[in-house]
Amino acid sequence: MLYRLLRPDENIENGLMATDPLSDTTVFQHVCKKTDSTLKSKFISTCGSLQAVLAFKGDIPNPIIVKIWEKNLPVVRIDLRTKENRNKYCTDANNFFHDEAMLFQLVLLVGYVPETHVELYTPSGLLE
């Protein structure tokens, strides 16, 4: 199970797509994009746990969080939760990259996530 904080322009009835599926953005650039909010990417960021997506949402008021069912999900997954996998995309000791990926248990998806694999997550108290 993966979790995602939806962008304001996303609607799960249409499935999920990256901001620019044809982008040449690298995994490293995508993870470090906080320095460039205009960066369009071919990756869909997800978190590997509910706790991680709650940390990711920070102070965002009224967040919309979804669950993504991984079974038979027709996308490429780039799981950055382990150091071994992170080192494939960042060979130096870039603390920001590694810290972000670990803190938010990042799993990047490449491709279209069909609406059949996405479900709203709205437990009581989450949106307070």
Positions of predicted regions on the chain:
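NAD-dependent ADP-ribosyltransferases
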Residues: 1-128
